[in-house]
Amino acid sequence: MIINYKALLDKDDLISLFEWGELSEGGQRNKANKVMKSIREQYKKDKGIDWKDTFIYRNISQNVIPTETFLKCCPEFKKSFRR
């Protein structure tokens, strides 16, 4: 799956990238949440600051992850982005 490059990824982007279409909607969301949690932890290790602390509005940080950190953790997806 090829998607347009953007700074932030949401759950739907992850579902498309990992091709979880055969799973139930709940299963897709559950797997996406696990990936997002691990990316946020990596962001904190790299930057020394919580991902949620980079946003003024807390609810935004819960729904997206930084693409840069995602690609650092999952370099096999670099070819899945179109700039």
How would you name each of these model-derived features?
Residues K11-D12:
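Residues within the helices of the helix-turn-helix
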Residues M1, K45-I49, R83:
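Polar low-complexity intrinsically disordered regions
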